[in-house]
């Protein structure tokens, strides 16, 4: 049975999130819907700068900004745009998300991330912004741009069915690494630097490290 099936859905409404505010409906502003929507957050950038290429909000939880970069690369390769801005922003403006993560046991009590440590007990939230400007390499060289790095390949998968919808899968992690290497035409032994997810949990860290070792350990002495 082929399980390599993609799922693509358009999603817009936030009615479920608004349920707790039913009693405060009298204070809802006319522009609140556009101001809170993911699509408007991205669309505003295109609007302000007058960009007319694809303007897409990507939500894949912790991997959102990385998948956004991947999708931007594919859009460039397909000729849908000639330049792309890709990345992500995290601003902690209210305590709600921290409370949710804390109750789910995801946050370290001291707010410090101890990835791949025996003392790992969750991660610490932080604010930041990271954006890259992407172009096809031939276009960047033609235009005399300073090329900082070249993205050789990438891949995206889903865990499928695991012990829980938020539970990771070592098998899926090893698969996405292998597919990315294949797409980049790069041998595991050629990779010298690895940036990990590093959830800082007793459950997630060993799984991620094991997946990375099972792929990148091949061909190494």
Q: What is each stretch, according to the model?
A:
Residues 1-221:
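Condensing-enzyme catalytic core of the thiolase-fold
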């Amino acid at each position: 049975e082929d399980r390599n099936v993609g799922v693509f859905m358009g999603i817009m409404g936030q009615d479920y999130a608004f349920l707790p505010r039913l009693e405060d409906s009298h204070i809802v502003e006319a522009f609140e819907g556009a101001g809170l929507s993911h699509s408007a957050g991205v669309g505003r950038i295109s609007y302000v700068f007058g960009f007319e290429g694809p303007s897409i909000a990507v939500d894949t939880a912790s991997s959102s900004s990385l998948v956004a970069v991947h999708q931007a690369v594919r859009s460039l390769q397909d000729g849908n745009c000639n330049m792309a801005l890709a990345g992500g922003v995290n601003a902690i403006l209210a305590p709600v998300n921290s409370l949710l993560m804390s109750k789910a046991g995801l946050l370290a009590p001291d707010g410090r991330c101890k990835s791949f440590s025996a003392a790992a007990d969750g991660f610490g939230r932080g604010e930041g912004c990271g954006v890259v400007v992407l172009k096809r390499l031939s276009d960047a060289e033609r235009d005399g741009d300073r090329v900082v790095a070249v993205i050789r390949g990438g891949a995206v998968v889903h865990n499928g069915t695991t012990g829980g919808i938020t539970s990771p899968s070592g098998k899926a992690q090893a698969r996405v690494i292998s597919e990315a290497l294949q797409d980049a035409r790069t041998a595991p032994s050629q990779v010298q630097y690895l940036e990990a997810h590093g959830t800082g949990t007793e459950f997630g860290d060993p799984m991620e490290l094991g997946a990375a070792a099972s792929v990148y350990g091949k061909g190494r002495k």
